[in-house]
Design a protein with these regions (language model features):
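Flexible, glycine-rich beta-alpha linker
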Residues: 1-5, 26-51, 73, 107
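Active-site Tyr-X1-5-Lys
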Residues: 2-33, 56-60
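Short, conserved glycine- and acidic-residue-centered signature motifs
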Residues: 9, 48, 150
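Short, contiguous clusters of charged residues that form electrostatic/catalytic patches at enzyme active sites
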Residues: 15, 53, 84-88
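C-terminal substrate-binding subdomain of Rossmann-fold SDR/epimerase-dehydratase oxidoreductases
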Residues: 59-203
Length: 203
């Protein structure tokens, strides 16, 4: 990374953490780590200029879907995948169950087959919403550079934490659309969230 603002900011954060860890914390055996996730999606995200919330808002209001970088490949994952990794890591840190020689940087991302292009995710969201022919317009931004490919190596988390992603990409899309549909129709999203958590935890 480092050729665009996004990846360079992540690399800078890791370097800063590493310098503090080796300078102040390593000798004290302090349980500390950094954790990075992929492109997290799921219900409850309404932030502006994010692919999934923007697509959902367009579908809900029956407006054209605009996408900026359709051929960019991203490591898509549901928020429950990310949180499960963070919780496992946190438990290991609290109980000091990690080998102190392991570098304390962790990636929690999807399996490689879940790394898909933006246009694939957008069309999948549209299909799951039930609007297969919804209009999409590509609106390229000239303001900044974006990497064509972002990915995460999750081998260490699998090996050292016995963590792995459990949801297929189809399930991730279904969970996401189901949550937003429930929200916009006034249904109990807390109950649905609990159902999704229960499904995930028993998968």
């Amino acid at each position: 990374g480092g050729l665009d603002n996004y990846s360079s900011s992540k690399a800078s954060a890791e370097l800063l953490f590493k310098s503090y860890f080796h300078s102040y914390f390593r000798k004290n055996y302090l349980s500390i780590a950094t954790a990075r996730a992929g492109n997290v999606i799921g219900g409850g995200d309404f932030k502006k200029d994010r692919i999934v919330p923007d697509v959902i808002k367009s579908l809900q209001s029956n407006k054209v879907v605009f996408i900026r970088n359709p051929n960019a490949t991203r490591p898509w994952q549901h928020i429950l995948e990310t949180l499960s990794g963070y919780l496992i890591l946190g438990e290991k840190l609290i109980n000091k169950k990690l080998n102190s020689k392991i570098i304390p940087n962790w990636n929690f991302g999807p399996n490689r087959k879940n790394c898909k292009k933006v246009k694939f995710i957008v069309q999948s969201l549209i299909n799951e919403w039930g609007e297969k022919n919804h209009k999409i317009i590509i609106k390229k931004s000239k303001n900044f550079h974006e990497s064509k490919l972002l990915s995460l190596n999750i081998d260490k988390a699998k090996k050292e934490l016995s963590w792995k992603p459990n949801l297929t990409l189809n399930e991730t899309i279904e969970f996401t659309v189901d949550w937003y549909k429930s929200f916009f129709t006034g249904n109990d999203v807390e109950d649905l969230s609990n159902q999704q958590i229960n499904y995930y935890s028993h998968k």
